[in-house]
């Protein structure tokens, strides 16, 4: 992967400080020519490899039960996976840049303007696994399935998971179904093996908010997050439960209705504490420390400007707030870790109706999902923030997120409904669809009294018409589609583009014409 026309920080800094005629002239009308001495190409060589070997034996009739034969499968699998990420010398620290303004250099600042420094990484993992599956007819109307799998990676603890499922046709048009299972996910090779990676992003500085908005410390600016890999990470493990029914009424041909209730309990969720939470933790620590003996305060998780150049009046504002003065933060150290239990539960409803008539074929699909619970039990560090806010140490407009009740928080809408309609007669077809995403609240806009800023639901409608025809011996299709038919705009949010991009899109009404030929 090669990216051209990037700017080197070290070459740019040297060119701007050059006192000769070769200096970079930022006032030149020909910007590209002026910056040419600092323009570089940036490369990245990423390689991943997966080798597998498996052996399976099956028997459709291991033994017989009154309702029929029992089928079984057993097997063994070996997997070897490797990953190598070779970054450009200007990103991996081979060629380093040190800022003449902040004094920061690698690994906090890379030599490519606008790109975070990233060290080279390589890792590999081998896994042995054995598994077995069984299908057992209990009665003519009831069937059970059982499965078990044991995985033994060479770089983390082994795990054994299982699944049991039951289907019971209690009537000719009603099927009850349920399952209970466990699952696991090992840390990916990057989380477990990368020494560190630096990423930049905007952050709300809780200290600046607490002392006074942008006076004397900015309350929002860009910061580096120094994410540290952790070879001691444990696999994520979960217990999954689901039950529901399928109804296919015999008196309404083509109609199927499904309903399922599900729950997932996951332990050892791999998380980062997060730069916003780290800022709030620094504020709580400063409040607890007090305004005296400020030279003795130290927070190893955050590197701040030690010489912010505050005036006596500005220092007095920190003292009035009861904390020691703090400069802007440059970097936050954040290590991958295993968190406590995460609980997710919800319900899904599906309606599917297919009908053929003399005027064409109709297909209608309605899906609705609702999340009834989404909670991440807090780590000790996060619980300290919750307790500080509950006791009044910090106000409610100092926000933090990622733990606790996550339902309806920052893009985690709890309701989603989709409707699809298809009609086809001969070679002509029409499609209509709609998608509704429910409301959620924007945590960073919470008021000091705890009032939440709610981002309303958003519904978009798409429509298309297509026609199949022949081009010689080949089948071809022409399709005209309108996306976001009603020109719905994304709800307003305090984000970079004015809307919550993690949940919404703001393309407005748009069209496209698609021509496809099958060879």
Regions found by a protein language model. Give the residues of each.
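Surface-exposed extracellular loop regions of Gram-negative outer-membrane beta-barrel proteins
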Residues: 1, 27-29, 52, 56, ...
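C-terminal beta-barrel architecture of Gram-negative outer-membrane proteins
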Residues: 199, 364-470, 486
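Short loop/turn motifs that connect adjacent beta-strands in outer-membrane beta-barrel proteins
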Residues: 62-70, 138-142, 173, 250-256, ...
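C-terminal beta-signal and adjacent terminal beta-strands/loops
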Residues: 267, 372-375, 433-445, 467-519
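Hydrophobic, lipid-facing positions within transmembrane beta-strands of outer-membrane proteins
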Residues: 49-55, 128-134, 160-166, 229, ...
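Surface-exposed, low-complexity loop segments enriched in small/polar and acidic residues
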Residues: 1-127, 155, 181-232, 260-345, ...
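Transmembrane beta-strands of outer-membrane beta-barrel proteins
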Residues: 70-74, 144-146, 162, 176-178, ...
């Amino acid at each position: 992967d090669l990216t051209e026309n990037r700017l080197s920080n070290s070459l740019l800094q040297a060119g701007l400080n050059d006192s000769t005629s070769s200096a970079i002239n930022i006032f030149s009308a020909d910007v590209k020519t002026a910056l040419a001495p600092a323009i570089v190409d940036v490369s990245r060589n990423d390689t991943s490899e997966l080798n597998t070997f498996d052996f399976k034996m099956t028997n459709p009739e291991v033994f017989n039960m009154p309702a029929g034969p029992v089928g079984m499968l057993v097997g063994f699998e070996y997997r070897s996976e490797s990953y190598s990420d070779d970054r450009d010398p200007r990103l991996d620290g081979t060629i380093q840049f040190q800022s003449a303004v902040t004094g920061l250099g690698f690994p906090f600042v890379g030599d490519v303007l606008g790109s975070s420094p990233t060290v080279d990484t390589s890792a590999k993992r081998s896994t042995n696994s054995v598994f077995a599956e069984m299908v057992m007819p209990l009665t003519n109307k009831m069937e059970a399935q059982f499965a078990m799998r044991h995985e033994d990676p060479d770089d983390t603890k082994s795990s054994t998971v299982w699944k049991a499922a039951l289907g019971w046709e209690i009537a000719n048009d009603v099927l009850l179904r349920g399952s209970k299972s466990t699952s696991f996910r090992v840390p990916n090779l990057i989380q477990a093996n990368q020494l560190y990676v630096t990423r930049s992003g905007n952050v709300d500085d809780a200290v600046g908010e607490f002392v006074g908005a942008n006076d004397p410390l900015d309350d929002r600016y860009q910061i580096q997050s120094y994410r540290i890999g952790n070879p001691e990470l444990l696999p994520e493990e979960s217990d999954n439960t689901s039950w529901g029914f399928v109804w296919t009424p015999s008196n309404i041909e083509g109609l199927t209705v499904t309903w399922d209730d599900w729950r997932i309990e996951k332990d050892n969720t791999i998380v980062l504490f997060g730069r916003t939470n780290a800022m709030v933790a620094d504020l709580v620590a400063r409040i607890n420390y007090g305004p005296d003996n400020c030279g003795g305060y130290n927070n190893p998780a955050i590197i701040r400007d030690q010489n912010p150049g505050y005036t006596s009046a500005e220092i007095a504002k920190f003292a009035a707030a009861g904390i020691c003065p703090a400069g802007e933060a440059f970097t936050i150290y954040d290590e991958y870790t295993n968190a406590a239990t995460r609980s997710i539960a919800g319900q899904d409803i599906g309606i599917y109706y297919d009908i053929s008539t003399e005027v064409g074929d109709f297909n209608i699909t309605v899906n609705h999902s609702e999340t009834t619970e989404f909670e991440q039990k807090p780590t000790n560090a996060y619980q300290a923030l919750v307790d500080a806010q509950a006791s009044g140490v910090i106000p409610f407009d100092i926000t933090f997120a990622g733990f606790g009740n996550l339902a309806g928080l920052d893009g985690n809408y709890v309701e989603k409904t989709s409707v699809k309609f298809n009609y086809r007669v001969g070679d002509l077809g029409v499609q209509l669809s709609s998608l509704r995403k429910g409301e959620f609240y924007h945590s960073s806009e919470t008021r000091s009294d705890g009032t939440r800023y709610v981002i309303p639901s958003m519904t978009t409608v798409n429509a298309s018409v297509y026609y199949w025809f022949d081009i010689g011996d080949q089948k071809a299709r022409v399709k005209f589609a309108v996306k976001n038919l009603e020109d719905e705009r994304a709800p307003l949010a305090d984000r970079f583009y004015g809307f919550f991009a993690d949940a919404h899109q703001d393309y407005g009404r748009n069209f496209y014409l698609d021509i496809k030929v099958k060879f």
